[in-house]
């Protein structure tokens, strides 16, 4: 990858050139977790005639206006996530990498103990257009019970106009605890609920630095109910 950054009074510009594409690696028959069928790594199709040799490009502009951090990005190149199609002859999943053209916007503002965030994305994935948006707020209680710990209350909403998977219209409520110690110990736990159906899921994340070079992450997810009309 080749990157170039330019800064001026109006903000910063970042340019990226990615001259060689690396296919996504999927778990084999003995790998976990994996899909119900094996992904055929020998049957890969690209929309681009240049295939792996296509030069992908990306650009990002970011600036600060008053209390708002603003970023605008665009990417054009091979999609990093292939479309998987079942092959009736091999009983495996064939890979197809379409050309992805997507533009995104991100906003963030901090006002006292309140943090506000908004992200929006418009993409054309091999001719299939879709839109997604995510926004939310977090209120932080500093120095809980006169300690160094902070407690954040998180509320988020996300929407994706693709209806072929679960949690495409969801609300999230969570608590974030941060100890603010030398090990950067923190816990995030909450409930995710599909507002367009009956699906819900509990999640928890724990992280702690073990030493200067090693950090521990533990993620847990428990599905309470998955709507029969959702694909996961």
Regions found by a protein language model. Give the residues of each.
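Short loop/turn motifs that connect adjacent beta-strands in outer-membrane beta-barrel proteins
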Residues: 10-12, 64-67, 127, 142-151, ...
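Transmembrane beta-strands of outer-membrane beta-barrel proteins
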Residues: 13-15, 70-72, 116-118, 149-155, ...
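Transmembrane beta-strands of outer-membrane beta-barrel pores
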Residues: 8-10, 17-23, 65, 76-80, ...
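Surface-exposed coil loops of outer-membrane beta-barrel proteins
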Residues: 1-59, 232
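Residues that define the transmembrane beta-barrel architecture of outer-membrane proteins
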Residues: 7, 53-57, 99-103, 110, ...
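Residues on the lipid-exposed face of transmembrane beta-strands in outer-membrane beta-barrel proteins
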Residues: 2-6, 59-63, 105-109, 135-139, ...
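Outer-membrane beta-barrel translocator/channel fold
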Residues: 1, 152-172, 193, 199, ...
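Outer-membrane beta-barrel translocator domains and adjoining extracellular loop/strand segments
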Residues: 1, 26-32, 82-90, 128-132, ...
């Amino acid at each position: 990858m080749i990157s170039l950054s330019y800064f001026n009074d109006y903000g910063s510009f970042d340019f990226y050139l990615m001259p060689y594409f690396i296919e996504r690696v999927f778990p084999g028959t003995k790998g976990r977790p994996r899909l119900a069928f094996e992904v055929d790594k020998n049957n890969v199709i690209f929309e681009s005639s240049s295939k792996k040799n296509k030069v992908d490009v990306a650009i990002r502009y970011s600036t600060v206006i008053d209390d708002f951090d603003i970023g605008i990005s665009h990417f054009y190149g091979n999609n990093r996530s292939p479309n998987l199609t079942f092959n009736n002859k091999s009983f495996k999943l064939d890979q197809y990498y379409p050309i992805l053209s997507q533009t995104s916007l991100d906003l963030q503002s901090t006002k006292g103990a309140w943090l506000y965030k908004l992200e929006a994305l418009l993409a054309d994935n091999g001719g299939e257009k879709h839109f997604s948006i995510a926004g939310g707020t977090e209120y932080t209680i500093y120095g809980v019970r006169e300690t160094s710990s902070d407690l954040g209350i998180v509320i988020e909403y996300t929407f994706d106009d693709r209806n072929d998977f679960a949690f495409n219209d969801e609300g999230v409520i969570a608590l974030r605890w941060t100890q603010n110690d030398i090990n950067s110990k923190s816990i995030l736990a909450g409930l995710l609920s599909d507002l367009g159906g009956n699906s819900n899921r509990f999640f928890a994340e724990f992280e702690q630095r073990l030493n200067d070079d090693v950090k521990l992450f533990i993620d847990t997810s428990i599905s309470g109910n998955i709507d029969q009309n959702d694909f996961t």
